[in-house]
Structure formats: structure tokens, C-alpha cells
Amino acid sequence: MSRVLLIDDDQHLLMALPAVFARSPCVITVDTASSAEQALRLIQATQYDTIVSDFSMPGLNGIEFLKECKAARPDIPIILLTGYGTLELEEKAFEEGAYALIQKPIDADDFLSVVTRAIIRRELRQAGLSDPMSPISIDAHTIRMESKRLSSRLRDIDERLRRQIKDADKDRSN
């Protein structure tokens, strides 16, 4: 049985995401925390296989929380959730040891896939076995997530341009 700590100040997300784990091929117990401080106390008292944390919470930000977690438990994969990911944020998160960065809104299948891979990878490392999760598969996931983020950004830009064209056409006709 695997144990995951889910941290977010959004109570709706804390209630919704544990249901996603019921679809996992692994048996996963989920603990929740609504603040980074509460999570750090739980991490000291409980052995987790993976930690999933919102990036933007009151108190510690995602990078500060990541540093504290890695100092306490360097072997635990940490997945950050963010609603406003930038390339700069991603680079900093990976530099500090994040396993993955997932964009909100969360796709349940992608989320479950990333968490399950993190759990399996940790278990294999603990058993001293090689990791079949090649960098290529991880890179493919990263590319897919970045593609979704960029597609969303392009849709937003397209919508803004359409509104500006529509406004300009109205101005010309007046």
C-alpha cells in the first residue's frame, strides 16, 4: 500500500482529488493538509511515498515548501500543482528537486499517471532495482503537459485578438 500526502488550501480540490486515486492500479492511502505548515508536521510523523502540493498557498510558497520537504525527506518525490506555470517556475522547481509540475485545471488521467509513476519509481529505487521509467517517457509527459499549456495560451491570445478586431471593426463603422 502506498501513502500520498495531498496539500492544497482549496478545500474543494482536497475533497475531489482523493477520489481519483480509487482508479489507480496501486492501493493508495491519501492524507490531506490545507497548509504547508500542517504538511511539514505530517511529513515528520508519517512516511509518504509521494507528496502532491499546490504551489501557491498562504505561508510558504511552492519552492520554499519544496526545499523544506527535500531537507527533511530527500527521497520522496514531490509533485507541484500550479494554476500559473511559467518556464521560469518550472526550471526553478526542477532545480530544487520537484518530480513534476502539473498545470491546473488538472486532467485526472494525467494526474493519476504522474503520481503512480512517482510511487513506482520510488519503490523501485528503495528496492535497489533499475528504473524502467526512462527519461524519454518522463520527457514525453513533460512535452504533453507543455503542449496543453501552450495550446491554452494560444486559445486565450486568439480570443483576445478576435475581440480587438471586432472592436476595431465597430470603431471604423462609427
Range-by-range predicted roles:
Residues 57:
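Receiver (REC) domain active-site loop signature in two-component systems and cognate sites
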Residues 11-31:
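Two-component/phosphorelay signaling modules centered on CheY-like receiver
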Residues 34-35, 61-64:
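Acidic catalytic/metal-coordinating carboxylates
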Residues 88, 106-115:
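C-terminal output helix
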Residues 130-174:
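C-terminal output/effector regions of signal-responsive regulators
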Residues 32-50:
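Acidic, metal-coordinating helix/loop segments flanking the phosphotransfer/catalytic sites
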